[in-house]
Amino acid sequence: MKAFATRALAFSVAAGQALAAVTQGVSDNTYNRLVEMATISQAAYANLCNIPATIQTVEKIYNAQTDINGWVLRDDSRQEIITVFRGTGSDTNLQLDTNYTLAPFDTLPQCVGCAVHGGYYLGWLSVQDQVQSLVQQQASQYRGYAVTVTGHSLGASMAAITAAQLSATYDNVNLYTFGEPRTGNQAYASYMNEAFDSASPETTRYFRVTHADDGIPNVPPAEQGYVHSGVEYWSVEPHSPQNTYICTGDEIQCCEAQGGQGVNAAHVTYFGMTSGACSW
């Protein structure tokens, strides 16, 4: 709603945050790209229903112990290798969601001092070999293809950790997350912002998409050492390029400023698409 935008801007003034940190409107190309990635991420809840026709499935990613689900896909029309993770879909996933212990990011030693969400790191460890092997196979066969990672909710944090890992091997990895919880500490956030050129919207390859008052980006609490990264793209109704806001600087100014708590209506629906509904 427009009211959300007004409240966010008012909050920025109260917090002393420069208004220039919130910019209204994105290009049609950017908006269409966000919607496309949201479609894939929401479809992951229902075995990739109704994904764009140009995208073909390479292989499924799965670990029974953590119930992490995902797929490696390929879009030859865009020359792109895509990895997508499903969000929370079971009690096993919920156990990962609520493990807020910060775990050292030991699989990425380049990320000095980095720690990430303990539950999602366990998820990453459970599928790391599958993901890296599948992406390597595709990248070797389709040289020059871009590498993109996406996901919603739990899948968003899985995507972020995966993209961080892949960025150590591949140039210009792209990351699109939807309703992403806070995923790591300040060292991790700084690493991600540098690795994904997130100093400005013009250069970023890390699009952290939020919606209205989605409550999940407010967890885990910042007081526990968690910090968001990437450039936030905040979508409000009615969805359009003009109603998409670019939020940089202080993370508590757009979605997070709305006071949403937990899994609410705004969390399960992005750009009018409800997780797994396949009605788009």
Curated annotation (Swiss-Prot):
It is found in: Secreted. Disulfide bonds join C49-C278, C111-C114, C247-C254. Glycans are attached at N99. The active site is at S153 (nucleophile), D214 (charge relay system), H267 (charge relay system). Residues 1-20 form the signal peptide. GO terms for cellular component: extracellular region. Feruloyl esterase (FAE) is a critical enzyme in bio-extraction of ferulic acid (FA) from plant cell wall. Synergistic action with the endo-xylanase XYN1 leads to the release of 72.32% and 4.00% of the alkali-extractable FA from de-starched wheat bran (DSWB) or de-starched corn bran (DSCB), respectively. Meanwhile, if the substrates were pretreated with 1.75% (for DSWB) or 1.0% (for DSCB) of phosphoric acid (PA) at 90 degrees Celsius for 12 h, the release efficiencies of FA were up to 84.64% for DSWB and 66.73% for DSCB. InterPro entries: AB_hydrolase_fold, AB_hydrolase_lip/est, Fungal_lipase-type. The keyword Methyltransferase does not apply. It holds the Pfam family Lipase_3. It comes from the Eukaryota. CDD domains: Lipase_3. Its main location: secreted. Glycosylated. Keywords: Carbohydrate metabolism, Disulfide bond, Glycoprotein, Hydrolase, Polysaccharide degradation, Secreted, Serine esterase, Signal, Xylan degradation. Metal or basic ions Mn(2+), Ni(+), Mg(2+), and NH(4)(+) decrease the activity by 4.4% to 14.1%. The enzymatic activity is inhibited by Zn(2+) at a low concentration (1 mM) but not a high concentration (5 mM). Loses about a quarter of activity by the addition of 1 mM of Cu(2+) or Fe(3+) and activity is completely suppressed when the concentration was up to 5 mM. Low concentrations (0.25 and 0.5 M) of NaCl improve the activity by 5.6 % or 8.3%, respectively. GO terms for biological process: antibiotic biosynthetic process; lipid metabolic process; monocarboxylic acid biosynthetic process; xylan catabolic process. One of its GO terms (molecular function) is feruloyl esterase activity. Optimum pH is 5.5. Optimum temperature is 50 degrees Celsius. Involved in degradation of plant cell walls. Hydrolyzes the feruloyl-arabinose ester bond in arabinoxylans, and the feruloyl-galactose ester bond in pectin. Belongs to the AB hydrolase superfamily. FaeA family. This is Feruloyl esterase 1. It comes from Penicillium parvum (Eupenicillium parvum). The lineage of its organism: Eukaryota, Fungi, Dikarya, Ascomycota, Pezizomycotina.
